[in-house]
């Protein structure tokens, strides 16, 4: 890691605007630019279909965001500032890895709908994954004690209405709900772009809702979705796999720890699939609210870091910034990561 540079890649004419959501849009916004601090992505050992875009771009950029907006200031100023800068950038799409409100505020329909409308102001396709503050934490007294399962269904009804992304341009998404045994799980998605498999999962922090009646079926669905993503990536000789979810799976905790137990089986599957795939694998998540890139997954036998696996955690409350990811087929690491600090959101230290 530790490469400084500029990136400038082409536009994406094959992703066309579609109608239907434009009435929700507030505005299109323009121009912003920042110096890029870039990090190489993952190490490399060697050099039912998912939805895919129309042409296999060899180089492109996309954005990763998460854990925003959390409060009124973020919702009315800081989050729109970030959307403004992303709208001015050349991006294939934007992925939000979960949590669009604080865990201490009520899980109302109005809170959901407000952010849904804001997502439609994205000029780029926007893909949203579910986080704990929007459903699994909604049973807390301080959130007005909503039923988590009912709130999860509300999220599905609002944010997964079609088999396309949100935003003013669209990306087609394959949903796990197309498989009869996983018909409930519309939020689990995948798509391919430029030789990379992207798979989004419903994995909420802090503990993946472990020990609840809904955990078992959802965990089984997530594991099957991960396995399918790797199987397709292998069959189609794709260059890399990126898994995206909200929860920090607590790589640093003992497997017996209360917070880790809900992730153990999933991490075992990710380890097995990563070792078999042998190409770059990236796990993106939010939850802990600070930007980092590291390689925390250890081999079960070697107890050494698995070289082709990288964890990326996105910015989050109170830091309302975004991460640019550059993809290049010709780079053996495939991904490079560039934190983008929103000029209007910078603090005076």
What are these regions (language model features)?
Residues 30-41:
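Bacterial N-terminal signal peptides
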Residues 71-73, 102-104, 130-139, 207-211, ...:
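Active-site environment of divalent metal-dependent phosphoester hydrolases
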Residues 61-65, 92-97, 102, 125-130, ...:
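Structural recognition of the beta-strand scaffold that forms the well-ordered cores
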Residues 106, 110-221, 297-328:
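Extended active-site neighborhood of metal-dependent phosphoesterases/phosphodiesterases
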Residues 44-111:
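N-terminal active-site segment of His-dependent metallophosphoesterases
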Residues 18-32:
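Bacterial N-terminal signal peptides that target proteins for export
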Residues 55, 86-93, 192, 197-199, ...:
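His/acidic metal-ligating clusters that form di-metal
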Residues 323-349:
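A short C-terminal boundary segment appended to hydrolase-like catalytic domains
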